[in-house]
Amino acid sequence: MEGPTHPKPSKDKTFSWDLMILVGVLLRLDVGMANPSPHQIYNVTWTITNLVTGTKANATSMLGTLTDAFPTMYFDLCDIIGNTWNPSDQEPFPGYGCDHPMRRWQQRNTPFYVCPGHANRKQCGGPQDGFCAVWGCETTGETYWRPTSSWDYITVKKGVTQGIYQCSGGGWCGPCYDKAVHSSITGASEGGRCNPLILQFTQKGRQTSWDGPKSWGLRLYRSGYDPIALFSVSRQVMTITPPQAMGPNLVLPDQKPPSRQSQIESRVTPHHSQGNGGTPGITLVNASIAPLSTPVTPASPKRIGTGNRLINLVQGTYLALNVTNPNKTKDCWLCLVSRPPYYEGIAVLGNYSNQTNPPPSCLSDPQHKLTISEVSGQGLCIGTVPKTHQALCKKTQKGHKGTHYLAAPSGTYWACNTGLIPCISMAVLNWTSDFCVLIELWPRVTYHQPEYVYTHFDKTVRLRREPISLTVALMLGGLTVGGIAAGVGTGTKALLETAQFRQLQMAMHTDIQALEESISALEKSLTSLSEVVL
């Protein structure tokens, strides 16, 4: 997988003896302290509220990004009217209202128009006018002149309700009857709701900020006084799994040395070629194996220490290398680097899954606010790739129309200009200049021949050869998309190969997740400090 490295030039991977650390280095990625990735999946709840009574006319929840989570919402006109249109409040026989089946039925055929209150237009008045004090303030509705707008955030149209008011044979029936009151009436509905409305978000509505509720006024179009209903639309955004504090210090992770038991016990037996007596300095880690498609979650709220995470990374790398190329692991040194970059990406080609709803990988895996400083090779690119990064693309796709989620294959990520993510929202990609490259993520572990370390203890003054340093990523690149799926020619079964690779994936997942929690806590801490200083 050869190719240029972006955006930084390659560096000398050899280090002096005082910096050469075999396992005890802190693995970290370049971190962007900016906003979360636009591809982040949230639990988004939209609510339509009757502003007079404060009751909810509709509450719809869905999973999606802040760019594509805009559902079509259904509610009934009487849900935003309540008792405000009763005859005692308006006129004796108004021909509209929600207190009687006949009025609900007569109201079905009455046109209406809607005016926005968020626009703050003085000529349109306030809530007492339904924000419709003069003609021209209406932006949507169901009238003969079909009001429209190029800037308002929603459209409201009439829905369709099955059933009529007067049935065949002269009997009375239909959805305008409340089945709680008229249980014997055929076709009666819950609450007598027979004035369905459909609310949809416009392009402007999808692009605006919904930090607070926005209000509208709805008025019936009839002879005489046009009655008013007021409603608001609001959005609540929640993370799918709220973050939890780990340890006494909310900023720093638990900096513990490796536990003795984790260096002894293991549930995974590494594959050794015949005659392989073991590798110096490599021990196994206690790790449970789960399917690649199953999100890896910590067994308990207690995060493992930094030392254990680092050893897990080295041992996971060893297992993956040993099962694919056992001759390389007979006698070698695997070292974690002591300076950035600590992870690297290898661009690969792969078959992603295209789904209309967020798959589990988009919901459970961390939505990284992280940047990969070095990506090499050539692979699959999505979106509009600038010339500076086109060398990474062996195949480029513009994407898909509509709202879709592109989940990266197991063991891979999308490296986007907005961060590292397991899943792409096409709505975000189509509306922004975002672009992504499919990559394998590998820890920056270097591979050395045995004499690399021995020469440091050799006191004889002689000319030493510059040691050859290879990253394991270059040796294993393409394993997830090619090696495991097609076999790597070692005679081992794909299942065994997958098990070894899972341990490395678990180690990386744990390390990155711990990093994200530390970064989130650090952001909160810095915000708190700035408030104190100011």
Curated annotation (Swiss-Prot):
Database matches in Pfam families: TLV_coat (PF00429)
Renumbered residue ranges of the record's region Disordered: 245-279
Cysteine pairings via disulfide bonds: C115-C132, C124-C137
Keyword Plastid included in the entry's annotation: no
Chain segments annotated as coiled-coil in the UniProt record: 496-534
Residue ranges, Extracellular side: 35-534
Name of the protein in its database record: Envelope glycoprotein
Gene3D superfamilies linked to this entry: 1.10.287.210, ENV polyprotein, receptor-binding domain
Short sequence motif named CXXC, residue ranges: 332-335
Organism: Feline sarcoma virus (strain Snyder-Theilen)
Post-translational events: Specific enzymatic cleavages in vivo yield mature proteins. Envelope glycoproteins are synthesized as an inactive precursor that is N-glycosylated and processed likely by host cell furin or by a furin-like protease in the Golgi to yield the mature SU and TM proteins. The cleavage site between SU and TM requires the minimal sequence [KR]-X-[KR]-R.
